[in-house]
Amino acid sequence: FTYAKNLMYDEESALFYRDGKYIYPKHKTNQGLKDFWSRGNGWVFAGLAKVLQDLPENDVHRAEYITIYKAMAKSLAAAQQEEGYWTRSLLDPVQAPGRETSGTAFFTYGYLWGVNNGLLDKSIYEPVIKQGWKYLTEIALQPNGKIGYVQPIGERADQHKNVGPETTADFGVGAFLLAGSEMVKYLNN
């Protein structure tokens, strides 16, 4: 984690670049901005929640992970779109506009876990959770039971690649189920 963090974590934005090829200013969005991939940051945010869940309280890295997790929570909240989703390029919605479910589900899970476990302030993050969950259950979840608007596998967020209600993938479904499992705990608290 330390190697990846040192290479790809942007302290200013509190987000991770996709990989070493996407680090600013070498790589920029079409608008000249930093490019942070939604699903990739979703894996990190949800991954930190999963690690913190099992990491001993006295682990030497725990405070560092909590600091990054909380900084990401703040940054991601500011990037959430009005409809409740996050765009494929987090800080440049024009780069690849429109709905994206896999990152949104990972973020919603991460926020739910943080509130459920006392690491995130419910009064601050409940609106983010509610908007994310509303998007997941009212827009991403299709009448036939499929989870739509999942960005396909690919190297970058391509504004010319259509992501629609029929676009699905197993990792999007898995992220949706993670969010759902944590929502049950949230509702029971």
Name these PLM-found stretches.
Residues 1-20, 25, 66-84, 127-145:
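Long, well-ordered core segments of solenoidal/helical folds
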Residues 1-8, 46-48, 52-55, 80, ...:
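Sec/Tat-exported extracytoplasmic proteins
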Residues 20-39:
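Acidic/Ser/Thr-rich, low-complexity mid-to-C-terminal regulatory regions of eukaryotic proteins
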Residues 24-29, 89, 158-160:
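Short glycine/proline-rich turn/loop motifs
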Residues 34-37, 59-66, 93-104:
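Short, surface-exposed loop/turn motifs that are enriched in glycine and acidic residues
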Residues 35-50, 105-107, 176:
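Alpha-helical bundle segments that constitute or directly flank the non-heme di-iron/ferroxidase center
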Residues 45-91:
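Oxyanion-binding "anion nests"
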Residues 86, 93, 98-189:
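CBM-like carbohydrate-recognition segments
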